């Protein structure tokens, strides 16, 4: 395994980040299923981003409790792997970041999930191809109404009740980027996803965070709770780093979270 870790370091000139990520993932599948390793990998990435994001909020007891629980979950997962295997995870996370930096307009994690052929292992999930999400966003996003909402309130939100890995939200954000060419859309539109599958929540959260989008992803059943309101149990909510920037913090100061979450 150590030799493999070294070989991955030597592949830094190889721009095929997806291939290198899949290679690293499969190296961890000795005694574990591909789905288990994928879920662990994604959970570690999500917790790393989330706990860093809410760290300034840990002065409040409810956020401190969530931070502690996620930190314990991180340690529980990572301790299932050897010291040598643990060295692969930050390298794989870096590959995800590099891929999205070069080609942001894609559903990277959803594509990898389907590429690894692990969807059938988890309730037969199938993620809509990103090109289809792009077409749907272009056809359904009411730019005029969105513009009016932003002009009237200063912000608008986009909600996906079954977000999967976040393809629809990402494609909607690309439409917003084209629409608000005179403004930074990241300061005027926030994105909310919801899914019953925690691995999907993690995937969507990672991608929204790395795309620099303000918002959050809720781990809950959309059939029972279809409205995108912030639940009282904040452990179910995964806030993106942009959600805590000064712009959105001030908006929450002037508008209650209950109103902002509608």
Q: Locations of the language-model features?
A:
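SAM/dcSAM-binding transferase cores
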Residues: 229-262
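Conserved S-adenosyl-L-methionine
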Residues: 132-238
């Amino acid at each position: 395994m150590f030799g493999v870790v070294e070989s991955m370091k030597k592949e830094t000139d190889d721009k095929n980040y997806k291939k290198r990520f899949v290679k690293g993932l499969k190296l961890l599948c000795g005694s574990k299923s591909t789905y288990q390793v994928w879920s662990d990998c994604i959970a570690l990435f999500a917790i790393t981003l989330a706990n860093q994001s809410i760290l300034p909020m840990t002065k409040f007891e409810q956020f401190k409790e969530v931070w502690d629980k996620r930190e314990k979950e991180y340690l529980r997962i990572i301790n299932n792997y050897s010291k040598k295997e643990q060295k692969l995870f930050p390298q794989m996370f870096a590959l995800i970041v590099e891929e999205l930096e070069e080609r942001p307009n894609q559903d990277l994690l959803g594509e990898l999930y389907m590429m690894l052929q692990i969807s059938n292992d988890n309730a037969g999930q199938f993620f809509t191809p990103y090109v289809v999400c792009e077409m749907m966003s272009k056809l359904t996003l009411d730019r005029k109404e969105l513009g009016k909402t932003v002009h009237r309130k200063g912000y608008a939100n986009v909600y996906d009740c079954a977000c999967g890995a976040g393809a629809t939200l990402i494609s909607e954000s690309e439409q917003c980027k084209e629409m608000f060419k005179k403004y930074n859309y990241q300061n005027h539109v926030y994105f909310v996803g919801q899914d019953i599958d925690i691995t999907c929540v993690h995937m969507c959260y990672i991608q929204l965070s790395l795309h620099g989008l303000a918002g959050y992803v809720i781990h809950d059943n959309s059939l029972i709770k279809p409205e995108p309101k912030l639940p009282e149990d904040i452990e179910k909510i995964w806030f993106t780093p942009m959600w805590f920037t000064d712009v959105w913090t001030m908006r929450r100061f002037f508008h209650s979270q209950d109103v902002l979450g509608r």
